[in-house]
């Protein structure tokens, strides 16, 4: 998105589009499901549940963390990840509002 045009969109529109972009890969959706099911996970546990290399999983975790959907806390040599419930809830609200307007349901 061109920087000059970014001011033409609301903060919520920009936030939702960035989150949607982060969710636009099935591995990232799976990572969110893994974190939901396990509450917290270290990177190695997530890697064990995906058909991807550790470096690829790490890149997906970075993208999810960048938009705030997950939090990562360093514990010694490991990083422990969990869902950022505040952002997950606000994303749910943004999506519900958007689809309620679109389909008028």
Please name every model-derived segment.
Residues 26, 64, 90, 94:
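Solvent-exposed, charged/polar functional surfaces in cytosolic regulatory/catalytic domains
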Residues 1-16, 36-37, 85-105:
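Amphipathic alpha-helical dimerization/coiled-coil segments
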Residues 5-9, 19-20, 53-54, 71-72:
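Short amphipathic alpha-helical segments, especially helix-boundary/capping motifs
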Residues 65-75, 82:
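Beta-hairpin "wing" of winged helix-turn-helix
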């Amino acid at each position: 998105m061109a920087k000059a045009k970014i001011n033409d969109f609301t903060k919520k529109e920009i936030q939702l589009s960035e989150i949607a972009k982060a969710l636009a890969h099935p591995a990232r959706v799976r990572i969110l499901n893994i974190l939901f099911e396990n509450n917290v996970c270290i990177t190695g546990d997530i890697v064990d549940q995906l058909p991807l290399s550790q470096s690829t999983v790490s890149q997906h975790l970075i993208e999810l963390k960048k938009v705030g959907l997950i939090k990562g806390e360093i514990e010694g040599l490991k990083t422990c990840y969990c869902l950022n419930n505040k952002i997950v809830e606000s994303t749910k609200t943004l999506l519900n509002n958007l689809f309620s307007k679109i389909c008028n349901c």
